[in-house]
């Protein structure tokens, strides 16, 4: 039986999001044929997941260490930009973007990616809230998404 990781979702073809998987989820992830994982949490992923990435020849980009050691700190613009620069490179795909629960940090990066796709803000925030669940959304993350300047990714010609 294939079991997806918590808060798993397909963002686009070959672009997935989730919370940190455990061993039960590894057979499911194998089917995705991942080339890259973008890990947004400040702490290291679980050792079993690190071993899985090595065994599957998946490149792990640990961006979370760049901004904080506190899991409650909001994601920084620098980390979002680094994640988006990876996400606009075809060589990164298939890719999984994840943090511990696949909610706030992952949702912020996906929300900014949606801005690059020219989604309207209400649709972006609805998707963010759907993965966060209930009233657990963070207004600072929503403001970050709303105010995020897409030109920082591609330059003024965008």
From Swiss-Prot:
Signal peptide: none annotated. Gene3D superfamilies: Protein tyrosine phosphatase superfamily (3.90.190.10). SUPFAM superfamilies: (Phosphotyrosine protein) phosphatases II. InterPro entries: PFA-DSPs (IPR020428), Prot-tyrosine_phosphatase-like (IPR029021), Siw14-like (IPR004861), TYR_PHOSPHATASE_DUAL_dom (IPR020422). Its EC number is 3.1.3.48. One of its GO terms (cellular component) is cytoplasm. PROSITE patterns: TYR_PHOSPHATASE_DUAL. CDD domains: PFA-DSP_Oca1. Keywords: Cytoplasm, Hydrolase, Protein phosphatase, Stress response. Residues 7-158 form the Tyrosine-protein phosphatase domain. This is Putative tyrosine-protein phosphatase OCA1. Putative tyrosine-protein phosphatase required for protection against superoxide stress. It is found in: Cytoplasm. GO terms for molecular function: phosphatase activity; protein tyrosine phosphatase activity. It catalyses: O-phospho-L-tyrosyl-[protein] + H2O = L-tyrosyl-[protein] + phosphate. It comes from Mycosarcoma maydis. It comes from the Eukaryota. PANTHER family: TYROSINE-PROTEIN PHOSPHATASE, TYROSINE-PROTEIN PHOSPHATASE OCA1-RELATED. It is an enzyme of class 3 (hydrolase). Belongs to the protein-tyrosine phosphatase family. The active site is at residue 99.
